[in-house]
Amino acid sequence: MQRDLPSGTVTFLFTDIEGSTKLLHELGADGYAAALAEHRRILRKAFSAHGGVEVDTQGDAFLVAFPTAPGALRAAAAAQETLARGPIRVRMGLHTGMPHLTEEGYVGQVVHEGARIAATGHGGQVLLS
């Protein structure tokens, strides 16, 4: 997989929709699909505007790498500001460290810690370590 992933000290941004199953029931399949597409558009726009590189996405969650912590924080703030106008609430976590970079992405404790930080948040929050 060929991407320009940052190396050395990296700030990870993890995102996840809060209550996605409940939201699916409330909006219905078509409404949820439209909201999810808008959520992805908003997040990807914020990531790219602030130097982020999408590492992975699963369902409604993203893992994004940034070469700088300020860029990651600006992306998270911009995304949350825009998302606040819609039905989807997203929890986000930022964690900085020195992961091991492989041909397929990142491995290391820093990645696991970042995921745990994001998982403790609530929709609309950005947690920092």
Report residues per predicted region:
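Catalytic NTP-binding/metal-coordinating core of nucleotidyl cyclase/transferase enzymes
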Residues: 1-75, 82
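Catalytic beta-strand-to-alpha-helix segment of the class III nucleotidyl cyclase homology domain
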Residues: 3, 44, 63-129
